[in-house]
Amino acid sequence: MPESPIRKLAPLAAAAKKKGVKVYHLNIGQPDLPTPQVGLDALKHIDRKILEYSPSAGYLSYRQKLTEYYKRFKINVTADDIIITAGGSEAVLFAFMSCLNPGDEIIIPEPAYANYMAFAISAGAKIRTIATTIEEGFSLPKVEKFEELINEHTRAILICNPNNPTGYLYTRREMNQIRDLVKKYDLYLFSDEVYREYIYTGSPYISACHLEGIEQNVILIDSVSKRYSECGIRIGALITKNAEVRAAVMKLCQARLSPPLLGQIVAEASLDAPEDYYRDVYEEYVERRKCLIDGLNRIPGVYSPIPMGAFYTVAKLPVDDSEKFCRWCLEEFDYEGETVMMAPAAGFYTTPGVGRDEVRIAYVLKKEDLERALIVLRKALEAYPGRVKVNE
């Protein structure tokens, strides 16, 4: 089971704080923006004498309300198509365990969310990665590259759209390319779409559920964690029109009894958040994105493409090893009593040696803190003993 590149340096950050150093957390996608007040009010006003099990598939009222939410994105599903899970992570794990046998293979563009590997190991499956590069903005390679990986063990393709960790948004051409592969080889398409609210380029959001001809192959993964700053209530969803897959998933849901009761109450109420809540959150991320990307690309030797969605970017640094650099920032460096914590990007790749000069950065801090973190990062790079000379 691999370590999490997002969390494995947390003890070093805790030790730095204990010494009085302020740590700017750029490593983890924990939004700092407020949870919708309607969700908090629902939690505050829970008036129950018993906190009972909920149905294993989740409350019907919540699933019905979700269908209206998805219609806003032209995703037409019924309450029966939706299974509520304990976060998007459980949805991914249950999808793998329901659709894959030990030894089956999943094709995933890399870099990819690191926990996918852990879930695949739990399901006895194997991940085959297809390379995307920072130089190409993390766009997908040609279809022939996918077909080179497809064999008798291949059962699925997984995408995250918009992407974590890169912020890349798949184009219509790329989504059609994936559809054609799924249809040609009769594969499952696992599509993690938890960042659909956060698209910044004017390009269309194309859900896997929009792709014609593969409706029975698509398993959509969703979560309220990033949409409503509700990571702690652990509510996600697995959505598919494939009744056989739903039946298999329900066996796992029944074995784990029920998704979180209180979390469902908060999540259902949060669907009534006013439009200005979504607008204000979106506009804040637009501003933060510009602040971060402009600031990164002004630092000598640093390069980041412009992320099109989500609230992450992968940046290339002029360092010998980004994990060593991230550790050094926490253990040996501070600038005026402050330092930065980032996620070494090698942990988002399975190909050995790739991503060693890259980091994932989450722009989940207010603009003033991002500006200060960029100053601290610049000073850290100037002082780091393992800095590499690049053409600047």
Residue ranges and their predicted role:
Residues P2, L9, A16-Y24, I28-I46, ...:
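PLP-dependent class I/II
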Residues A14, T67, K71, F96-M97:
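Generic structural signal for well-ordered alpha-helical scaffold segments
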Residues K49:
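Basic nucleic-acid-binding alpha-helical/helix-turn surface characteristic of O6-alkylguanine DNA
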Residues Y53-A86:
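Conserved N-terminal alpha-helix of the aminotransferase class I/II PLP-enzyme fold
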